[in-house]
Design a protein with these regions (language model features):
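TPR/TPR-like (Sel1-like) alpha-helical repeat modules
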Residues: 158-168
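Short inter-helical turns and helix N-cap capping residues of alpha-solenoid HEAT/ARM repeat scaffolds
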Residues: 7-8, 38-40, 69-70, 104-105, ...
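Structural detector for internal amphipathic alpha-helices that build alpha-solenoid repeat scaffolds
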Residues: 2, 10-24, 32, 41-56, ...
């Protein structure tokens, strides 16, 4: 209740922490808050942290949430699946993140690209990510360039160079150029 009615960051953080320690039983409440149109970005961040903490105890619930009708719930679920992939090597979670690359919501696709950049090996995912350099959403394209850079995917320099030449968004183009520069170091 305090999570919905109080704006004090300390109270919100304490509430999210308490809900995380409750465990899987709190997931429905946390996901329900995400569906509330008055949910603030700060609350979303706290919910994402709580879900990450809970996720290892309720992996199926997160997988189910990744199929929600509500984009904000799918984003949070995809974000929280990262811990399962990194610590548990959960192949179902990884498959769900790969599926999220084709989600109708650009926010979900952007989160999936970011998570792949944090949790996978470059040689396993670089072809998937190269395709996202042509995504219809600029944030997805930016996140893709950053993910390739984070993965140190030197084998994608040619694809990034091609993307930089055809990119119409100057902000995306700048990120792609930084990725090319970083990946070119030591080649």
């Amino acid at each position: 209740e305090a999570f919905l009615e109080d704006s004090d960051p300390v109270v919100l953080g304490s509430s999210a922490g308490a809900m995380a320690t409750i465990g899987p039983e709190a997931m429905d409440s946390l996901l329900g808050i995400l569906k509330n149109p008055d949910c603030t970005p700060f609350q979303v961040g706290l919910i994402n942290l709580a879900l990450s903490f809970i996720g290892s105890k309720a992996p199926q619930a997160l997988l189910d949430a990744a199929d929600s009708d509500v984009a904000e719930v799918r984003v949070a679920a995809i974000s929280a699946l990262g811990d399962q992939i990194q610590t548990l090597g959960d192949s179902d979670a990884q498959k769900k993140v790969f599926e999220a690359l084709e989600d109708p919501s650009p926010d979900v696709r952007a989160e999936a690209v970011t998570l792949i950049g944090k949790s996978c090996d470059a040689e396993d995912v670089q072809e998937l990510l190269i395709k996202k350099l042509a995504d219809s959403d600029s944030q997805v394209r930016k996140n893709t360039a950053m993910a390739l850079m984070k993965l140190e995917a030197k084998g994608t320099i040619n694809a990034l160079t091609t993307a930089a030449k055809t990119e119409s968004d100057k902000d995306v183009q700048a990120v792609i150029k930084v990725a090319i520069k970083i990946l070119s170091l030591g080649v």
